[in-house]
Amino acid sequence: MLSVVPRPVVVRAPSKVNLHLAVGDLRDDGYHELNTVFQALSLSDTVSVAPAETLSVTVRGEDARVVPTDSSNLVWQAAEMLAAESGRRPDVEIAIDKGIPVAGGMAGGSADAAATLVGLNALWQLDLSREELDGFAAKLGSDVPFSLHGGTAVGTGRGERLLPVLSRSTFHWVLALAKVGLSTPTVFRELDRLRADGNPPRLGGPEDLMHALTTGDAATLAPLLGNDLQSAALSLNPGLRRTLRAGVAAGALAGIVSGSGPTCAFLCAEADAAVRVSAELAGAGVCRTVRVASGPVPGARIINDAAEGSH
């Protein structure tokens, strides 16, 4: 019998923007109750998994130096989790190519974890169902299940309980990446502090926004975007106000802080408008860099041939 070394499995996973993010009270488990509408965007990370002598993580791309390559990285935890489940050692090399901003509120770490689950499921020929992968994803982090599924979805609980949403058409976004990241726990704590002082108002339900998604009309969707964490992100980084104003002044239909920030996401009427807005924002000096993206797109998907087995 000829034993063929499995080829690396390469997986692409999308970033996300929260079109609606309503943050409830702090729960007994230390998390906040969330009601959110996610949309997966074309700005993505690529993760390659390959057999190795021991578990290792490498990262390249913008801000790669600040991404941990030890057990604090979700991809490491994903590998150990699947290895324990399948009764094997997690002897794989995980290579991450970052396209999603680090600490930008766009679920880059969650995307990498989802990609690792998908990649190792193929590499190790585990034949886990999507539902089984969902269970592992929810244990890894609140945004990991959505990174698996992609598209547009309502998330409840910590954001891990998902219900797909019909979203007609493609929406066009400009993403303004900030010079310095924001820690998600810090932003939630700041929101708790602001609320203890009596501010700010809370978002209602996302029903109108979900209806707007079914129309496929960006102009209808734009005024319905909302994020309870935005006030906290602006409190921690007041310069984001300039970024939001500049994007709308450049022609965006609306601007919003993405998740816990500090990335600002601008919804545009069409692809050409997104290119124009990105050019103006890039020259305005209000952010580190800009990216153009579209959504919804699929969740974590293998983009090369699946691993070959032993023959």
Curated annotation (Swiss-Prot):
ATP binds at P101, V102, A103, G104, G105, M106, A107, G108, G109, S110, A111. Pfam families: GHMP_kinases_C, GHMP_kinases_N. Gene3D superfamilies: 3.30.230.10, GHMP kinase, C-terminal domain. One of its GO terms (biological process) is terpenoid biosynthetic process. The active site is at K16, D143. It catalyses: 4-CDP-2-C-methyl-D-erythritol + ATP = 4-CDP-2-C-methyl-D-erythritol 2-phosphate + ADP + H(+). Its EC number is 2.7.1.148. The keyword Repeat does not apply. Pathway: Isoprenoid biosynthesis; isopentenyl diphosphate biosynthesis via DXP pathway; isopentenyl diphosphate from 1-deoxy-D-xylulose 5-phosphate: step 3/6. Coiled coil: none annotated. InterPro entries: GHMP_kinase_C_dom (IPR013750), GHMP_kinase_C_sf (IPR036554), GHMP_kinase_N_dom (IPR006204), IspE (IPR004424), Ribosomal_Su5_D2-typ_SF (IPR020568), Ribsml_uS5_D2-typ_fold_subgr (IPR014721). Keywords: ATP-binding, Isoprene biosynthesis, Kinase, Nucleotide-binding, Transferase. One of its GO terms (molecular function) is ATP binding. HAMAP family: IspE. Belongs to the GHMP kinase family. IspE subfamily. Catalyzes the phosphorylation of the position 2 hydroxy group of 4-diphosphocytidyl-2C-methyl-D-erythritol. This is 4-diphosphocytidyl-2-C-methyl-D-erythritol kinase. The gene is ispE.
